[in-house]
C-alpha cells in the first residue's frame, strides 16, 4: 500500500471519529431517549391525575419552540425537583435530555407550570416530550448528515 493511500485511510478514520463542530450537541447511542420518555410517562400516569382541559395555542407554541427547549426543560426539572425530589426517577430521566438539546438564548419566557398542579405538569410535559421526540428524530438526524 502506498503512503498516499494510507494517508487517505487515516484521514477517513479521523473524520469518522472526530467530534462534529457544527454547534449542535452530539447524540450518543448509549442513552435510549424513547425509553426514557416512556419511563417518564409511565411514572406520571401512576402518580398524577389525568389532565383536565387542554393546552391553549400559546402554550403549544411555547412548548414547540426549539429555542426554548432548554428553558422549558429547566422549568420541568424545577417542578419535578420541587414536587418529587432531586433524586426522583422522573428528574433523573429529564436530566438525560440536557446534553442533546440546543442551548439557544431564548427570546421569550419558558412554559409556566401551575404550582402544585400535577395535571398541568403532566399535560404540558406530554406535549413537550412529543416536541423533543420530533427534534431528536428530525433535526439532529438532519444535522448529522451535513
Curated annotation (Swiss-Prot):
Signal peptide from the UniProt entry: 1-17
Swiss-Prot/TrEMBL GO biological process terms: immune response; positive regulation of cell population proliferation
MF terms in GO: cytokine activity; growth factor activity; interleukin-3 receptor binding
Primary site of residence: secreted
InterPro entries: 4_helix_cytokine-like_core (IPR009079), IL-3 (IPR002183)
PANTHER family for this protein: INTERLEUKIN-3
Protein name (Swiss-Prot/TrEMBL): Interleukin-3
Originating organism: Ovis aries
